[in-house]
Amino acid sequence: MPSLKDLKNRIGSVKNTRKITKAMQMVAAAKLRRAQEAAEAARPFAERMTAVMTGLAGSVGSSESAPRLLAGTGSDKVQLLVVMTAERGLCGGFNSSIVRLARAHAAKLLAEGKTVKILTVGKKGREQLRRDLGQHFIGHVDLSEVKRMGYPVAQGIARDVLDRFDKGEFDVATIFFARFQSVISQIPTAQQVIPAVFEGEGEVNSLYDYEPSEEGVLADLLPRGVATQIFTALLENGASEQGARMSAMDNATRNAGDMINRLTIQYNRSRQAAITKELIEIISGAEAL
């Protein structure tokens, strides 16, 4: 049975831990608010661009003059997986859920006889995937120095991906990230970005004249579309990470409080037992006299 001193030290240690987790929860809440605002600010631009490209893609269709980023290479043999995770942990199952989805997708592709290449964004995903898929790594993007996510970061990643596509290094590119729904709900998502996939209705092209041509405008917009999708995914990931961290630290703070209560009860009982024992010894000694 632990001594009173040991129990007191444990209570003090857990109280210090609770202070840390509470502070991390408050910091995550502030960062989450900023991340949500950034995602909401970028959404109208992304939606408008997607609508225009969807309309153009519908007009261009599968014609021979369709841009390569839309038509593809005609093969899906080589697949690039861009796995986006956080640089830090202590955010519940945020990182592992994205990695789990990417790992399952890679296993499915490998079982079909396809070639898999992996580009990691964020340290935590790279650490987890290295164990069984490290031989498929072709690059890594370090975000440890990025204080606030901006469009230039997404442009850099998109430029690397597009350069690899132009060199014929892969046929299909899919990004993996967590779509933010709420503080307690982040949905692991796989989204194909190359060749471009458009769903729903776009802009009515009869209202516009495109120069030099619809194909030319679409060819110019598609690389920007890839960067925009990556930027949106990074913003969603940022909000999801902070939401998951806020939830995890809230749980840790409440668990620490429960542990403090249990240890305090144990401490009081041990102290009471020690006092009772001393009183019995004093009374027994007095009776012996």
Curated annotation (Swiss-Prot):
What membrane topology is given?
Peripheral membrane protein
What Pfam families would the database entry show? Answer: ATP-synt (PF00231)
Give the main localization category.
Answer: membrane
Offer a single GO CC term for the protein: plasma membrane
Q: Which PROSITE patterns match?
A: ATPASE_GAMMA
Q: Which Gene3D superfamilies match?
A: 3.40.1380.10, ATP synthase, gamma subunit, helix hairpin domain
What are the GO BP annotations of this UniProt entry?
A: proton motive force-driven plasma membrane ATP synthesis
For this chain, the family text in UniProt reads: Belongs to the ATPase gamma chain family.
Q: What does this protein do?
A: Produces ATP from ADP in the presence of a proton gradient across the membrane. The gamma chain is believed to be important in regulating ATPase activity and the flow of protons through the CF(0) complex.
Q: What protein name applies here? A: ATP synthase gamma chain
Organism, as annotated: Cereibacter sphaeroides (strain ATCC 17025 / ATH 2.4.3) (Rhodobacter sphaeroides)
